[in-house]
């Protein structure tokens, strides 16, 4: 569909964005849906962030996705937050409602929908590698599903402790914090029903890295999940598969988040299978350009 004066604007703000697949996924999906919209990648330097709300209103953007490092920093500039965004203290979708900017967070729901799509039961005890913003959203969602115990491992113990306290204060689940090291991971992984890598270790271009070793995973019966989707098969998941463990990559969560974004901004359900196909094909091209 040709661009014209009626073309509606959407986009992604963050820094850096050169490896993001969101513009490709959203633009092809919008075309598939027959909508006169365009989705732009907007690299914003930190000092320019306060100018974004007025730009959204002036240019009449329908909405934006928000990624690192602005998920928390954008909040003071918004007019309203969804319950999830307020609870998590982070926003990844902004909807422009006639100049009224409403912030949402779809991270946790995206992960839960991905689990359901794969038929994975998270069980009773979740172990998190990393205690940043992604871990916060996913942990809160799992607590809502009834996961009774959540353990957080991080190289920054104070960050893990803060997240554990946050979950304990807002749910009936028991949450604990530990300093990330081999012995603690091995001990906790033996009783975990699901282990989730919420760290960037293993993400493109450092695809040969894993937050833990094969020996660390030996003896665990947990489902392994990686929030990384580039590459589709992270080193962490490969090690688990070598030991016969069930695994789930971050593609489903990424696509579900994208679908939820379009539902929020457009009020329509997008073609989920098509969105996944677009991203998967692009990632496979990166692995094998021929």
Curated annotation (Swiss-Prot):
Pathways involved: Metabolic intermediate biosynthesis; chorismate biosynthesis; chorismate from D-erythrose 4-phosphate and phosphoenolpyruvate: step 4/7
Residue sites binding NADP(+) per the record: 130-134, 227, 250
GO molecular function: NADP binding; shikimate 3-dehydrogenase (NADP+) activity
UniProt keyword list: Amino-acid biosynthesis, Aromatic amino acid biosynthesis, NADP, Oxidoreductase
Cysteines joined through disulfide linkages: none
Record-listed E.C. numbers: 1.1.1.25
Xref: Gene3D superfamilies: Leucine Dehydrogenase, chain A, domain 1, NAD(P)-binding Rossmann-like Domain
BP-aspect Gene Ontology terms: amino acid biosynthetic process; aromatic amino acid family biosynthetic process; chorismate biosynthetic process; shikimate metabolic process
Residues involved in shikimate binding: 20-22, 67, 92, 107, 229
Domain of life according to the entry: Bacteria
Statement: the UniProt record of this protein carries the keyword Amino-acid biosynthesis: yes
EC top class named in words: oxidoreductase
Keyword hit for Ubl conjugation: no
Reactions catalysed, as given in the entry: shikimate + NADP(+) = 3-dehydroshikimate + NADPH + H(+)
CDD domains to which the protein is assigned, alphabetical: NAD_bind_Shikimate_DH
Record-linked Pfam families: SDH_C, Shikimate_dh_N
Active site as annotated: 71 (proton acceptor)
HAMAP family: Shikimate_DH_AroE
Quaternary structure (record): Homodimer.
Described function: Involved in the biosynthesis of the chorismate, which leads to the biosynthesis of aromatic amino acids. Catalyzes the reversible NADPH linked reduction of 3-dehydroshikimate (DHSA) to yield shikimate (SA).
Family listed: Belongs to the shikimate dehydrogenase family.
Protein name per Swiss-Prot or TrEMBL: Shikimate dehydrogenase (NADP(+))
Gene transcribed to yield this protein: aroE
